[in-house]
Amino acid sequence: MPPKHNPLGLNPLQLRTLTLLQQLARLPDYSQPGEEAGSIALTRLPHPHGDHFHIGEAVVSSRDATGLRNPAVWAALERKGLVRSTPPSAVVTPRGLDYDTGLRETILHWADHG
């Protein structure tokens, strides 16, 4: 039997937010190794300009990132063991890094932006 998609039952906003946190964790401009083995500490979050923002080479619609500033989303992700919130930053746990949201190709756009 194939693995269940979204086994933790994350809602769409939580899935989008985790997808963005996973991408931020891949980039040294936004992250560094965490204290826990396999975790990544996020050192900052991107700021939107207009209707989008950049995560490295990817362009993301601001509407897909509303969860980055939503305390309820962070609380849910933390409760499910995917992140640890340590304001003003956060740690994405190994479980959070490995969780397949299925949205990476949907919300991260790799177009040229000038």
Which residues are covered by each model-predicted region?
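Short, amphipathic alpha-helical interface elements at domain boundaries
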Residues: 1-65
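Short, amphipathic alpha-helical interaction segments positioned at domain boundaries
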Residues: 3, 79, 97-114
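Amphipathic alpha-helical interaction segments
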Residues: 28, 81-84, 103
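Generic signal for short, ordered secondary-structure residues
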Residues: 55-57, 75, 106
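Short amphipathic alpha-helical interaction segments
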Residues: 61-80, 84
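Minor-groove-contacting beta-hairpin "wing" of winged helix-turn-helix DNA-binding domains
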Residues: 89-94
